[in-house]
A protein has these predicted regions:
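DPxDG-like acidic metal-binding loop motif
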Residues: 64-100
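Phosphate/pyrophosphate-binding loops at sites that engage ATP/ADP/AMP, CoA/4′-phosphopantetheine
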Residues: 50-64, 112-113
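Short, well-ordered alpha-helices that flank and scaffold nucleotide-derived cofactor binding pockets
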Residues: 52, 85, 89, 110-111, ...
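Short, conserved active-site loops that position catalytic residues or coordinate cofactors/metal ions
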Residues: 48-49, 79
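Oxyanion-binding and handling regions
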Residues: 1-30, 39-45, 96-207
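Catalytic-core segment of enzymes that process non-peptidic bonds
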Residues: 34
């Protein structure tokens, strides 16, 4: 039987920081999932959180990394994307980037009427004083297709059908790890340089 790879997924697109680890050294090799309500303190706790889950002396054994690329808080998203890119570059390790909306799409689609499932739908989020951010998705045969990356929609736009963003970092970081495991098994290249954070609005406000 082929040995399981050592894989790590990071998600910080909300006030909670999520990590998921597939570690072949763990009994049963079930994924380890942790969620910490670090909020703005993530800038001080990020590295120590990762080190506590996976000691630095084992980082060179990583065979794949994944990170949620946003939308989310500017600082939190940027921190984990930068850390994941740096690790992937230094370790020559594949890096998968997935938007936070794409991660929640499978569970949000279940809120739609049965007749609409399998068809394109929108995930939207209203931001105070900014507007509505939306991305379009379609799920076929268990695969999430991101038809439109999350972006700030034109004022007054109301795409349908639409489901409001609902945060569940524990479920979504576990989904991210599952996607990483699937991509690793398929031999996907996953170059780190292509993974960038998604900022639908300017972090410095209106210009």
């Amino acid at each position: 039987m082929t040995a399981l790879p050592l894989l790590l997924a990071l998600h910080s697109c909300s006030d909670c920081f999520g990590m998921a680890l597939l570690d072949p050294q763990q009994p049963g090799a079930d994924p380890l999932v942790q969620v910490h309500p670090d909020g703005r303190g993530l800038s001080n706790s990020l590295i120590s959180r990762v080190q506590a889950l996976l000691p630095p002396e084992r980082w060179s054994q990583l065979q794949g990394l994944a990170v949620a690329t946003g939308p989310g808080g500017f600082t939190g998203t940027r921190l984990t994307v930068v850390m994941a890119r740096t690790l992937a570059q230094q370790l020559d390790c594949p890096l998968l980037g997935v938007s936070s909306y794409a991660l929640m799409a499978p569970r949000l689609e279940r809120q739609l009427p049965q007749s609409m499932q399998g068809e394109p739908f929108w995930i939207t989020q209203e931001l105070p004083r900014r507007g509505v951010v939306g991305g379009q998705y379609r799920i076929t045969a268990g695969q999430v297709h991101e038809l439109s990356l999350p972006t700030l929609l034109p004022q007054g736009a109301s795409p349908q059908p639409a489901v409001e963003v609902q945060l569940d970092v524990e479920a979504d970081v576990a989904q991210l790890l599952k996607l990483l495991q699937r991509s690793h098994a398929a031999g996907a290249a996953m170059p780190w340089a292509e993974v960038l954070p998604i900022y639908p609005t300017s972090p410095v406000g209106q210009v």
